[in-house]
Amino acid sequence: MSGSTGERSFADIITSIRYWVIHSITIPSLFIAGWLFVSTGLAYDVFGSPRPNEYFTESRQGIPLITGRFDSLEQLDKFSNPF
């Protein structure tokens, strides 16, 4: 017979009231925090991705496609330059 590690069983944890009191607060809080992170636009700023209205500018309406293998840095500079 093997020894006990002293840890609570999974069934004992998920049937406890303390587990559900804690998780009934944290799970909705994480959902609301994620929704606010995306809906306020902070996710665009943190990760540096363009907002949906910034993909195409007035001066550049085409797809920014890199075609050259050896001059790719120059093409990237041209695409990232708004003027």
Curated annotation (Swiss-Prot):
Cofactor note: With its partner (PsbF) binds heme. PSII binds additional chlorophylls, carotenoids and specific lipids.
Record's bilayer topology term: Single-pass membrane protein
Annotated localization: Plastid, Chloroplast thylakoid membrane
Signal peptide: none
Family: Belongs to the PsbE/PsbF family.
GO biological process: photosynthetic electron transport chain
Keywords in alphabetical order: Chloroplast, Electron transport, Heme, Iron, Membrane, Metal-binding, Photosynthesis, Photosystem II, Plastid, Thylakoid, Transmembrane, Transmembrane helix, Transport
UniProt protein name: Cytochrome b559 subunit alpha
Organism from which the protein derives: Phalaenopsis aphrodite subsp. formosana
